[in-house]
């Protein structure tokens, strides 16, 4: 299963990074360059004035599709997203399957004021500290990749550092884990990370399991304004969209079209 492979490789890479650059060094970097994360909850909460909130993704490749965008310029892409009115920007930092780099966060941070998500396979507090040092405002935690205890601990650590957390779910068990962990922002990924199959009716089934007051984010398979309107009608606040935008020549127009119709 691809998720297991990615987690295994992530842990191997992490061991080397921790050896090359210990956590206390990261902490020292933070002391010299303090960074206060931006308000993610306000950016992603649906409102009557702006019902459809977009998390636009900077992504070169994926395990299911390979390279998605050959002409890949992270800073330019992020600036176009911001200019088009994206409410947050997701930055892939996983290097092997997604061709990401954590340096992209720092580069993009210099040129944008929009909240940034570190999207990666986070399994250790070290990666959360990294996210803060490199300039992220929130992180992704995948419920399927973590035990309930691990998810709760990592989420608490992120909140302790001032980072918000998007907890990604795909089934009822994941949702239970997210609620138990105390997640404020819960993602529902239409894509199964084990076999890449899509289930576009997932939000309809999982949203009733969520308590009131949570910010709900729909992920994967989104490419039309009408899809977003319908999902917003049943309770989705924000939409994480990557591949659709990455395949467009005119990214700015694509964001405006999907957001405004």
From Swiss-Prot:
GO terms for molecular function: indole-3-glycerol-phosphate synthase activity; phosphoribosylanthranilate isomerase activity. Keywords: Amino-acid biosynthesis, Aromatic amino acid biosynthesis, Decarboxylase, Lyase, Tryptophan biosynthesis. It comes from Campylobacter curvus (strain 525.92). The gene is trpC. Pathway: Amino-acid biosynthesis; L-tryptophan biosynthesis; L-tryptophan from chorismate: step 4/5. Its EC number is 4.1.1.48. Belongs to the TrpC family. It is an enzyme of class 4 (lyase). This is Indole-3-glycerol phosphate synthase. It comes from the Bacteria. The keyword Chaperone does not apply. It catalyses: 1-(2-carboxyphenylamino)-1-deoxy-D-ribulose 5-phosphate + H(+) = (1S,2R)-1-C-(indol-3-yl)glycerol 3-phosphate + CO2 + H2O. Disulfide bonds: none annotated. GO terms for biological process: L-tryptophan biosynthetic process.
């Amino acid at each position: 299963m691809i998720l297991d492979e990615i987690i295994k490789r992530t842990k191997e890479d992490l061991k080397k990074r921790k050896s090359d650059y210990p956590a206390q060094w990261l902490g020292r970097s933070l002391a010299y360059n303090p960074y206060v994360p931006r308000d993610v909850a306000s950016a992603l909460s649906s409102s009557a004035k702006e019902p459809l909130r977009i998390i636009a993704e900077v992504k070169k490749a994926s395990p299911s599709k390979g390279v998605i965008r050959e002409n890949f310029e992270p800073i330019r892409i992020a600036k176009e997203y911001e200019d088009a009115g994206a409410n947050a920007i997701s930055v892939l930092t996983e290097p092997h399957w997604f061709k990401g780099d954590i340096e992209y966060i720092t580069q993009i941070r210099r040129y944008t004021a929009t909240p940034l998500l570190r999207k990666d396979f986070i399994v250790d507090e070290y990666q959360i500290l990294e996210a803060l040092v490199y300039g992220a405002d929130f992180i992704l935690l995948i419920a399927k990749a973590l035990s309930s205890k691990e998810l709760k601990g990592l989420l608490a650590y992120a909140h302790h550092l001032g980072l918000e957390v998007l907890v990604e779910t795909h089934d009822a068990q994941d949702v239970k884990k997210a609620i138990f962990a105390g997640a404020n922002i819960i993602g529902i990924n239409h894509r199964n990370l084990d076999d890449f199959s899509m289930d576009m009716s997932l939000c309809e089934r999982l949203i009733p399991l969520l308590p009131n007051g949570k910010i709900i984010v729909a992920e994967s398979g989104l490419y039309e304004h009408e899809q977003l309107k319908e999902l917003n009608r049943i309770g989705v606040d924000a939409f994480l969209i990557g591949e659709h935008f990455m395949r467009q020549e005119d990214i700015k127009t694509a964001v405006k079209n999907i957001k405004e119709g």
